[in-house]
Regions:
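Anionic-ligand binding region
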Residues: 212-214, 221-242
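Glycine-rich phosphate-binding loops at beta-strand->alpha-helix junctions
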Residues: 93, 148, 278, 282-313
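Short glycine-rich, Thr/Ser-proximal phosphate-binding strand/loop in the N-terminal lobe
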Residues: 75-125, 166-168, 232-260
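Glycine-rich phosphate-binding loop and adjoining helix at the ATP-binding site
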Residues: 115-128, 132, 138-139, 148-206, ...
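Short glycine-aspartate micro-motif
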Residues: 84-88, 137-141, 214-218, 288
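Short beta-strand scaffold segments in enzyme catalytic cores
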Residues: 94-98, 146, 223-229
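Short linear motifs in low-complexity or flexible loops
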Residues: 10, 14-15, 20, 24, ...
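Glycine-rich phosphate-binding loop plus the immediately following alpha-helix
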Residues: 176-200, 232-273
Length: 330
């Protein structure tokens, strides 16, 4: 396990499956038993199961990923002075900052708790409020949980609830969010081009090297993921809402509620088992573990998780906001 200190529009997220449909730029539980302990191949196994022990890469050894192979040549010169407002919308908080053309943060980040209940218009207003506290930008990237296609929200797991994750789902919010054109709404509110993506895709854009098949799993309020093939966002199944056992989803199994209930040691063991389960499904060249909770994985589990896995900083959810504009489609 290594440490690094430091999508583009996929149709996957809250529904548990989907396809990448292309990129559109808009103008203008209390459970005492681990359900996966020995329950399924690849997910079980004894807690002391051995894995590869690898070295730690210190935070100051981090260098920006190399440029993906497939970038739109026409955007390279145009992007020299382009600034991007990057907004990371999570289940517990929403933060924003301004990036230069290379994805470097050039303004202090501003943050606000995610306001619930949260209809689409309220999220747009929240983004506009954060933007008003920052320098002006040429374009905006919004990363948010859920299935996003061409900037349109197909489904979102958190924002349809009364008080946030694991609270009651409100039918009116399900209807309001279904097929809401978030990209167009944000562009109208801010008066600049917008790109609205799944939040794991934005984070992945900030860390991938452009070599081989790379996957990111983000650990926060829930679980997010994205897959990149030679620097290009690839069609992928969103595992967060996939079933584990006893009606649990992966969000339930290793989300923030379970981490708080179990403690970091037991929760970290679950994370390792999820990685072990996903590895034969994706056969990645490299897996990145990001999100706010990636830093909470214990050293004991990091030592067993494999040298094809790298922990990356939570800031990737922000810094990827610039790079994802230049990621070409196959």
């Amino acid at each position: 396990m290594g440490h690094l200190g430091g999508g583009v529009d996929a149709g996957v997220g809250a529904s548990g499956h989907g396809e990448t449909d292309g990129l559109t730029q808009h103008g203008g539980q209390g459970r005492g038993e681990d359900p996966l302990d020995g329950a399924q191949p690849g997910l079980g196994g004894p807690p002391g199961e051995e894995g590869a022990v690898v070295g730690q890469v210190e935070a100051d050894a981090w260098h920006a990923p190399i440029e993906p192979h497939r970038l739109r040549a026409s955007t390279r010169l145009a992007a020299v002075s382009t600034t991007t407002l990057s907004v990371d919308c999570g289940g517990g908080g929403i933060k924003a900052s301004v990036l230069d053309c290379e994805g470097n943060i050039i303004s202090r980040a501003v943050r606000t708790p995610t306001p619930y209940p949260l209809p689409p218009e309220k999220l747009v207003e929240t983004i506009a409020s954060l933007a008003s506290q920052l320098p002006g930008a040429d374009r905006v990237t919004v990363g948010m949980p859920g299935m996003i296609r061409h900037g349109v929200v197909v489904a979102t797991p958190h924002y349809i609830t009364k008080d946030g994750p694991r609270s009651r789902v409100l039918p009116d919010l399900v209807e309001a969010w279904g097929r809401f054109d978030m990209g167009a709404a944000v562009s109208r509110a801010l008066g600049i081009p917008s790109l609205v993506l799944n939040d794991a895709e934005v984070a992945g854009a900030g860390v991938v090297t452009g070599h081989g098949l790379e996957m990111i799993v983000t650990l926060g309020t829930g679980l997010g993921n994205a897959v990149f093939d030679n620097g290009v966002l690839a069609p992928h199944v969103e595992v967060s809402q996939g079933p584990v056992r006893w009606g649990l989803t992966y969000d339930d199994y290793i989300g923030e509620h379970e981490r708080l209930r179990l403690g970091d040691a037991h929760w970290s063991r679950r994370v390792r088992r999820v990685v072990d389960a996903l590895r034969p499904m994706y056969l990645w060249d490299r897996l990145y573990l990001g999100g706010g909770n990636s830093r909470r994985i214990t050293a004991a589990q990091l030592a067993k998780i494999g040298d094809d896995v790298v922990v990356v900083p939570n800031e990737a959810g922000m810094t990827g906001g610039a790079r994802c504009w230049d990621m070409a489609r196959p």
